Amino acid sequence: MVGSFVFEAELRHQLGKGASRRLRHAGKVPAVLYGGGGEPVSLLLDHHKVVKNLENEATYSHVLTIRFDGREENAILKAVQRHPAKPVVMHLDFQRVSAADKIRVHVPLHFINQESSVGVKKGGVVSHGMVDVEVDCLPKDLPEYIEVDLAQVDIGGIIHLSDLKLPAGVEIHALAQGVGHDLPVASVHAPRTAEGGEGGAG
Protein backbone atom coordinates (compact mmCIF):
# COMPACT_ATOMS: atom_id res chain seq x y z
CA MET A 1 0.00 0.00 0.00
CA VAL A 2 1.61 3.22 -1.20
CA GLY A 3 0.01 6.61 -0.68
CA SER A 4 -0.96 8.75 -3.67
CA PHE A 5 0.64 11.81 -2.06
CA VAL A 6 4.17 11.93 -0.72
CA PHE A 7 5.35 14.13 2.14
CA GLU A 8 9.13 14.36 2.44
CA ALA A 9 10.19 14.85 6.05
CA GLU A 10 13.17 14.70 8.35
CA LEU A 11 13.48 13.71 11.98
CA ARG A 12 13.04 16.58 14.38
CA HIS A 13 15.59 16.66 17.19
CA GLN A 14 14.89 20.12 18.62
CA LEU A 15 11.72 20.10 20.71
CA GLY A 16 9.87 22.79 22.65
CA LYS A 17 8.08 26.04 21.77
CA GLY A 18 11.25 28.05 21.30
CA ALA A 19 12.68 25.48 18.92
CA SER A 20 9.40 25.31 17.00
CA ARG A 21 9.43 29.07 16.56
CA ARG A 22 12.98 29.03 15.21
CA LEU A 23 12.18 26.19 12.85
CA ARG A 24 9.11 27.97 11.47
CA HIS A 25 11.22 31.06 10.80
CA ALA A 26 13.54 28.76 8.86
CA GLY A 27 10.63 27.63 6.66
CA LYS A 28 9.96 24.33 8.42
CA VAL A 29 6.67 22.84 9.67
CA PRO A 30 6.79 20.70 12.84
CA ALA A 31 4.73 17.52 12.66
CA VAL A 32 4.06 14.33 14.57
CA LEU A 33 3.43 10.82 13.24
CA TYR A 34 1.62 8.58 15.71
CA GLY A 35 -0.64 5.55 16.12
CA GLY A 36 -0.66 2.20 14.41
CA GLY A 37 1.11 0.52 17.28
CA GLY A 38 4.29 2.54 16.74
CA GLU A 39 6.00 5.18 18.82
CA PRO A 40 5.23 8.85 18.08
CA VAL A 41 7.84 10.41 15.81
CA SER A 42 8.57 14.15 15.67
CA LEU A 43 9.16 15.38 12.13
CA LEU A 44 10.00 18.48 10.13
CA LEU A 45 8.64 19.30 6.67
CA ASP A 46 9.31 22.06 4.17
CA HIS A 47 6.61 24.73 4.54
CA HIS A 48 6.40 25.56 0.83
CA LYS A 49 5.89 21.91 -0.13
CA VAL A 50 3.34 21.39 2.64
CA VAL A 51 1.28 24.36 1.48
CA LYS A 52 1.38 23.08 -2.09
CA ASN A 53 0.18 19.62 -1.00
CA LEU A 54 -2.60 21.06 1.16
CA GLU A 55 -3.94 23.09 -1.77
CA ASN A 56 -5.17 19.78 -3.21
CA GLU A 57 -8.44 18.82 -1.51
CA ALA A 58 -7.67 15.14 -2.08
CA THR A 59 -4.75 15.32 0.37
CA TYR A 60 -7.25 15.28 3.23
CA SER A 61 -8.97 12.08 2.09
CA HIS A 62 -6.10 9.95 0.79
CA VAL A 63 -3.59 7.60 2.30
CA LEU A 64 -0.31 9.51 2.31
CA THR A 65 3.27 8.32 2.16
CA ILE A 66 5.55 9.94 4.74
CA ARG A 67 9.24 9.58 3.85
CA PHE A 68 11.87 10.20 6.49
CA ASP A 69 15.11 8.77 7.83
CA GLY A 70 15.43 6.33 4.93
CA ARG A 71 12.01 4.75 5.35
CA GLU A 72 8.39 5.22 4.36
CA GLU A 73 5.21 5.01 6.42
CA ASN A 74 1.59 5.24 5.34
CA ALA A 75 -0.60 7.72 7.17
CA ILE A 76 -3.63 9.96 6.95
CA LEU A 77 -3.66 13.65 7.77
CA LYS A 78 -5.60 14.02 11.03
CA ALA A 79 -5.08 17.69 11.89
CA VAL A 80 -3.67 20.89 10.45
CA GLN A 81 -2.91 23.82 12.75
CA ARG A 82 -2.81 27.16 10.93
CA HIS A 83 -1.80 30.62 12.10
CA PRO A 84 -4.95 32.64 12.96
CA ALA A 85 -3.84 35.72 11.01
CA LYS A 86 -1.15 34.63 8.55
CA PRO A 87 -1.11 32.08 5.69
CA VAL A 88 1.20 29.86 7.72
CA VAL A 89 0.87 26.17 8.58
CA MET A 90 1.93 25.77 12.22
CA HIS A 91 1.76 22.01 12.79
CA LEU A 92 0.60 18.74 11.23
CA ASP A 93 -0.68 15.53 12.80
CA PHE A 94 -0.30 12.31 10.82
CA GLN A 95 -1.85 9.01 11.93
CA ARG A 96 -0.30 5.75 10.76
CA VAL A 97 -2.56 3.37 8.87
CA SER A 98 -2.46 -0.36 8.22
CA ALA A 99 -4.04 -2.05 5.20
CA ALA A 100 -5.92 -4.39 7.54
CA ASP A 101 -7.33 -1.80 9.96
CA LYS A 102 -10.27 0.54 9.39
CA ILE A 103 -9.65 4.27 9.52
CA ARG A 104 -11.95 7.19 10.31
CA VAL A 105 -11.60 10.14 7.93
CA HIS A 106 -13.51 13.27 6.97
CA VAL A 107 -14.31 13.01 3.26
CA PRO A 108 -15.47 16.08 1.26
CA LEU A 109 -18.95 16.19 -0.26
CA HIS A 110 -19.34 17.20 -3.90
CA PHE A 111 -22.79 18.59 -4.67
CA ILE A 112 -23.90 17.93 -8.25
CA ASN A 113 -26.91 18.95 -10.37
CA GLN A 114 -27.72 21.91 -8.14
CA GLU A 115 -28.74 24.29 -10.90
CA SER A 116 -30.78 21.63 -12.68
CA SER A 117 -32.56 20.27 -9.60
CA VAL A 118 -36.36 20.14 -9.62
CA GLY A 119 -36.64 22.60 -6.75
CA VAL A 120 -34.16 25.13 -8.13
CA LYS A 121 -35.98 25.18 -11.47
CA LYS A 122 -39.07 26.26 -9.51
CA GLY A 123 -37.13 29.11 -7.90
CA GLY A 124 -35.94 27.23 -4.83
CA VAL A 125 -32.63 27.81 -3.08
CA VAL A 126 -30.16 25.08 -2.12
CA SER A 127 -28.86 25.04 1.45
CA HIS A 128 -25.90 22.88 2.49
CA GLY A 129 -25.97 21.38 5.97
CA MET A 130 -22.38 20.11 5.82
CA VAL A 131 -19.40 20.13 3.48
CA ASP A 132 -17.79 16.84 4.52
CA VAL A 133 -18.74 13.61 6.25
CA GLU A 134 -16.85 11.32 8.62
CA VAL A 135 -16.55 7.77 7.30
CA ASP A 136 -15.12 4.46 8.49
CA CYS A 137 -13.42 2.16 5.97
CA LEU A 138 -10.28 0.24 5.11
CA PRO A 139 -7.55 2.39 3.56
CA LYS A 140 -8.05 0.73 0.16
CA ASP A 141 -11.73 1.76 0.14
CA LEU A 142 -11.21 5.40 1.13
CA PRO A 143 -13.08 7.61 -1.39
CA GLU A 144 -11.63 10.91 -2.56
CA TYR A 145 -15.09 12.46 -2.19
CA ILE A 146 -18.78 11.52 -1.98
CA GLU A 147 -21.28 12.90 -4.46
CA VAL A 148 -24.58 14.41 -3.36
CA ASP A 149 -26.99 14.43 -6.31
CA LEU A 150 -29.60 17.17 -6.00
CA ALA A 151 -31.28 16.57 -9.38
CA GLN A 152 -34.55 15.17 -7.98
CA VAL A 153 -34.84 17.32 -4.85
CA ASP A 154 -37.98 19.49 -4.92
CA ILE A 155 -38.75 22.54 -2.79
CA GLY A 156 -39.06 21.35 0.79
CA GLY A 157 -36.98 18.27 0.03
CA ILE A 158 -34.08 17.21 2.24
CA ILE A 159 -31.19 14.82 1.64
CA HIS A 160 -30.07 13.07 4.83
CA LEU A 161 -26.89 11.13 5.55
CA SER A 162 -28.78 7.87 5.01
CA ASP A 163 -29.66 9.00 1.46
CA LEU A 164 -26.03 9.22 0.34
CA LYS A 165 -24.76 6.60 -2.10
CA LEU A 166 -21.56 5.20 -0.64
CA PRO A 167 -18.82 3.16 -2.30
CA ALA A 168 -18.51 -0.47 -1.24
CA GLY A 169 -16.86 -0.90 2.14
CA VAL A 170 -17.56 2.66 3.31
CA GLU A 171 -19.79 3.48 6.29
CA ILE A 172 -20.87 6.85 7.67
CA HIS A 173 -19.76 7.05 11.29
CA ALA A 174 -22.71 9.14 12.51
CA LEU A 175 -25.28 6.60 11.27
CA ALA A 176 -23.74 3.94 13.50
CA GLN A 177 -24.70 6.11 16.48
CA GLY A 178 -28.44 5.69 15.87
CA VAL A 179 -31.40 7.15 13.97
CA GLY A 180 -31.12 10.49 15.76
CA HIS A 181 -27.78 11.07 14.03
CA ASP A 182 -29.19 10.92 10.48
CA LEU A 183 -28.43 14.59 9.89
CA PRO A 184 -29.52 16.72 6.92
CA VAL A 185 -26.85 17.12 4.25
CA ALA A 186 -28.65 19.48 1.89
CA SER A 187 -32.12 20.86 1.25
CA VAL A 188 -34.03 23.02 -1.20
CA HIS A 189 -36.23 25.70 0.32
CA ALA A 190 -38.52 28.35 -1.12
CA PRO A 191 -36.88 31.73 -1.73
CA ARG A 192 -37.44 34.35 0.91
CA THR A 193 -39.71 37.22 -0.08
CA ALA A 194 -38.94 40.90 0.48
CA GLU A 195 -41.04 40.77 3.65
CA GLY A 196 -38.80 38.07 5.06
CA GLY A 197 -41.21 35.17 4.64
CA GLU A 198 -40.91 32.32 2.18
CA GLY A 199 -42.56 32.54 -1.19
CA GLY A 200 -44.46 29.73 -2.76
CA ALA A 201 -43.20 27.65 -5.65
CA GLY A 202 -43.86 29.26 -9.00
UniProtKB/Swiss-Prot annotation:
GO cellular component: cytosolic large ribosomal subunit
Annotated protein name in UniProt: Large ribosomal subunit protein bL25
Pfam families: Ribosomal_L25p (PF01386), Ribosomal_TL5_C (PF14693)
Organism: Methylococcus capsulatus (strain ATCC 33009 / NCIMB 11132 / Bath)
A GO term for molecular function: 5S rRNA binding
Assigned keywords, A-Z: Ribonucleoprotein, Ribosomal protein, RNA-binding, rRNA-binding
One Gene Ontology biological process: translation
Family in the record: Belongs to the bacterial ribosomal protein bL25 family. CTC subfamily.
Keyword Transport attributed: no
Function per UniProt: This is one of the proteins that binds to the 5S RNA in the ribosome where it forms part of the central protuberance.
Quaternary structure and interacting proteins, as annotated: Part of the 50S ribosomal subunit; part of the 5S rRNA/L5/L18/L25 subcomplex. Contacts the 5S rRNA. Binds to the 5S rRNA independently of L5 and L18.
Superkingdom of the organism of origin: Bacteria
